[in-house]
């Protein structure tokens, strides 16, 4: 198979519907040199064909990143495989989902395991890691600039008290935000956070590369914070958007109350999904005026097809 590092190669493995109650969800990443990413992708594909997993793993020359779900045995199998491959310093977190959180199992080959679009070296240059207690102490200070490195729709579901929203739609836009909004604050303490920690590996590396002096980030990201921090000690407000069928999680990494608008992808609170503007898979208050009636008709057709497919499987 020919491979260009600028291309995305995606291979799928079949996933059977799990009969057991609940799914173990494992979020993981590690920046580590991978000599032959295409070979690792193929061996991962061979493995996941033999176990019941769903989710996505991204393989690149700089490491591995992804979230997968399955039964206990399947998760332990993929975890041990990666450990045997030398990924023994993974940022690794587990949670649970009552429903199947992903439709398929994907193994993707990419240039970056998280796409910033600017060359940085997080294995060599990265911000100061803080555990949840240290994080609370830092962001309570008045001389700290607290930045949410996630995208606008993620910020909408929840964030830390006092955090700045860069209003980015993709992580690729973050370097431009730094150039326009942070350049004059190189002498300030900068604290950044993201869902699982991987985006902050690159964002803190970027800032240090650009000459910022005091750059901090939350080790393990929001997910680790919600797992370890009691609600009465937490500075988190709202829910944490996740890229799977749960939409968002809250303290204890328990499934939250938000649902996702499948037309635009934005998270909705129970109050927002009760509004007349919400039609499942068709519209919500954030997108109802941004699509045509023809597009809405197409969305309704898609929902009918999905419902028919589900009925056929029963």
From Swiss-Prot:
Q: Name one GO molecular function term.
A: oxidoreductase activity, acting on paired donors, with incorporation or reduction of molecular oxygen
Asked if the keyword Oxidoreductase belongs to this entry, the reply reads: yes
Q: Name one Pfam family in it.
A: UPF0176_N
User: What SMART domains does the record tag this protein with?
Assistant: RHOD
Its recorded reaction(s) are: uridine(34) in tRNA + AH2 + O2 = 5-hydroxyuridine(34) in tRNA + A + H2O
Q: Domain named Rhodanese: which ranges?
A: 140-234
Listed PROSITE patterns? RHODANESE_3
* EC supergroup of this enzyme: oxidoreductase
* Protein keywords: Oxidoreductase, tRNA processing
Q: Does the keyword Oxidoreductase apply?
A: yes
The residues responsible for catalysis, as annotated, are: 194 (cysteine persulfide intermediate)
Q: GO BP, one example?
A: tRNA modification
Gene3D superfamilies associated with the record:
3.30.70.100, Rhodanese-like domain (3.40.250.10)
The EC number of this protein is 1.14.-.-
**UniProt record similarity statement:** Belongs to the TrhO family.
Task of the protein: Catalyzes oxygen-dependent 5-hydroxyuridine (ho5U) modification at position 34 in tRNAs.
Q: What is the protein name given in its UniProt record?
A: tRNA uridine(34) hydroxylase
